[in-house]
């Protein structure tokens, strides 16, 4: 398998087909705006985002985690503990898809069809890894630029602190997936 990483420019996107974006090291909001714009401008283009757990959210780690915890728990009250308010995603792939959804006009047919053409995965699925030539695109404008005293956290770290049991299950599944990937690569 041949893996190639290339920078991606919105003006050079194909009109149809599939584009695979590697989200590692990208700032979540910046990448989401780029993807939302591309989905709206190109109605026949499918975008696949891989490594969603490595997306970055800037800000103090404790502040970001507390914000997520408050967002998840604010709808349950003492008077009505079973209240089912808005469902807030916890997994990194679903969090990122929700961020992109917030940037699309979800009440119009254009926005709904654009969201259907977006796929977000944690790590890289085996179906994608089995391709003979894999081109992973990166968005240079959305990459995290490291500066002194810059505080950031990844979506995986946020997920680990919010839902440690689910994170641990996923971590074990990644180990099994790694073994399968080695088998695919060798045979």
UniProtKB/Swiss-Prot annotation:
Classification via PROSITE patterns: RIBOSOMAL_L13
Disulfide bridge map: none
Task performed by this protein: This protein is one of the early assembly proteins of the 50S ribosomal subunit, although it is not seen to bind rRNA by itself. It is important during the early stages of 50S assembly.
GO molecular function: mRNA binding; structural constituent of ribosome
GO cellular component: cytosolic large ribosomal subunit; ribosome
Keyword terms: Ribonucleoprotein, Ribosomal protein
Designated gene of the protein: rpl13
Domain of life of the organism encoding this protein: Archaea
Family of the protein in this entry: Belongs to the universal ribosomal protein uL13 family.
Assembly behavior: Part of the 50S ribosomal subunit.
The name this protein goes by in its record: Large ribosomal subunit protein uL13
Record GO biological process: negative regulation of translation; translation
Record-linked CDD domains: Ribosomal_L13
Xref: InterPro entries: Ribosomal_uL13 (IPR005822), Ribosomal_uL13_bac-type (IPR005823), Ribosomal_uL13_CS (IPR023563), Ribosomal_uL13_euk/arc (IPR005755), Ribosomal_uL13_sf (IPR036899)
Keyword Ribonucleoprotein: yes
Keyword DNA-binding: no
């Amino acid at each position: 398998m041949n893996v190639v990483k290339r920078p991606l420019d919105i003006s050079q996107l194909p009109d149809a087909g599939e584009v695979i974006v590697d989200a590692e090291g990208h700032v979540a909001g910046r990448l989401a705006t780029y993807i939302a714009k591309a989905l709206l401008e190109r109605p026949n283009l499918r975008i696949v985002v891989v490594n969603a757990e490595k997306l970055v959210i800037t800000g103090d780690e404790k502040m970001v985690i507390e914000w997520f915890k408050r967002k998840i728990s604010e709808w349950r009250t003492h008077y009505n503990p079973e209240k089912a308010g808005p469902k807030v995603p916890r997994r990194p792939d679903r969090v990122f898809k929700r961020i992109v959804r917030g940037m699309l006009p979800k009440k119009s047919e254009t926005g709904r069809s654009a969201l259907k053409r977006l796929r977000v995965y944690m790590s890289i699925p085996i179906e994608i890894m089995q391709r003979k030539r894999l081109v992973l695109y990166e968005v240079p404008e959305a990459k995290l630029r490291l500066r002194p005293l810059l505080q950031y956290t990844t979506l995986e770290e946020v997920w680990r602190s919010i839902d440690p049991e689910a994170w641990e299950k996923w971590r074990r599944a990644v180990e099994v997936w790694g073994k399968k990937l080695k088998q695919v690569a060798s045979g």
